[in-house]
Amino acid sequence: MEEVFKYIIGLGAEVMMPIIFTILGVCIGIKLPKALKSGLLVGVGFVGLSVVTALLTSSLGPALSKMVEIYGLELGIFDMGWPSAAAVAYNTSVGAFIIPVCLGINLLMLLTKTTRTVNIDLWNYWHFAFIGAIVYFASDNIYWGFFAAIICYIITLVMADLTAPAFQKFYDKMDGISIPQPFCQSFVPFAIVINKLLDKIPGFDKLNIDSEGLKKKFGLMGEPLFLGIVIGCGIGALGCGSWKEVVDSIPSILGLGIKMGAVMELIPRITSLFIEGLKPISDATRELIAKKYKNSAGLSIGMSPALVIGHPTTLVVSLLLIPVTIFLAVILPGNRFLPLASLAGMFYLFPMILPITKGNVVKSFIIGLVALIVGLYFVTELAGFFTLAAKDVYAATGDPTVNIPAGFEGGALDFASSLLCWGIFHLTYSLKIIGPAILVVLALGMAIYNRIRMTRNDAKEALNNK
């Protein structure tokens, strides 16, 4: 059975998800041609996103490597990037069974009415496998690994329910969809607290600029396309050791700028493919459940945050944070992690932050900045345990994507930089008995609160409809 799940996971998101969505579509009553088209569009979306992400990584890579060499930015933790982190997570004993375990937990929570999210974003289950894997290798106990993964899953489902109304209101065409992805959800506490603090600053409301406001105020210069070109050229220039080298490298500098601009322009177009493919599945699933089960109003289908990473504010803020993050990684005392490969996944910080800031570019930037500063220290602290897992997987599989260069430890912003990952790890591993007890109380408390909240909302709606 373990080999079966490893084979399915090994297909990759671009193959696994179209198959799953096609089968799911047929099972819920969609005709095969329409279900197949939906599945294939999802697959095309994943391929397109992979191509654009690879373009971003391959374009930035040489310039960033030169910056590291010129300015002596050597740090001790090698950035694996989220694809390698996912490969490590899924190739452990926890990862091999994470999908059926989490689906079982999801079903149990639906039956007990402690969630209304049906999480079909199976590829992103690797996040739960990740926290489970590092706890497993740290404690040498697979049961604690599954415990950590399950706790993370329960908390994430409740968070998805709690944030669903604001998410659906902020983003277009997202009715009935929630985001049960722990990396995105882990930044919600940062966003709520910092957003309220910023609102208390006199005059800060005058900086209420969203992506449309940038376009109106700065015209072409406020477009993500133009900002991508400018920042790309800036990074390319910083990768030169002298003015003469800058002049000699003008073609490559301009080329990097155009490629960065292309990434900013292509990502929204690619995310539209996800929406086109997933909407029929989402709508049909909600209709079927509404017919079969009473009191199913408000049900949400758990989808990938890739649906909304093309929002202009996300693109602009992510782009601005790339050079800032590199600078901070170098100057922050005690940090040993230099993010390079992880920068391509910067977009995934913001899907759940934007509904809280209402798309405000300044607020989103500040929240992202604080989250990244804290996240760099989280990655640094968890690197040793992630390295244990990566080395074990490499020894077993020989997969070069999980190989850590000699003399380095391994790390990745996604998922190691999140408060949820760091907190669950230390409460499970460092505090032994009292920590797991706290997590059980927290997870059960959130689930019970969620049930009470949803029951009250149902009662209010019933009264309003009379």
Model-inferred region functions:
Residues G45, L49-A96:
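Membrane helical hairpin/interfacial module
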Residues V52, S65-V68, P83, A290, ...:
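Generic preference for flexible, low-structure residues
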Residues M1-T53, S93-G302, G310-P312, P355-K363, ...:
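Signature of multi-pass transmembrane helix bundles
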Residues L56-T57, L64, V68, L382-V393:
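Membrane-proximal extracellular juxtamembrane segment immediately upstream
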Residues Y71-I77, F97-L103, L122-F130, I150-Y153, ...:
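Mid-membrane cores of alpha-helical transmembrane segments in multi-pass membrane proteins
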Residues L111-T115, I301-F385, A389:
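Hydrophobic alpha-helical bundle architecture
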Residues S58, W82-P83, E265, R269, ...:
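A short glycine-/small-residue-rich loop at the edge of a beta-strand within enzyme catalytic domains
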Residues L56-S59, L73-E74, T92-S93, F183-P189, ...:
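Hydrophobic transmembrane alpha-helix bundles
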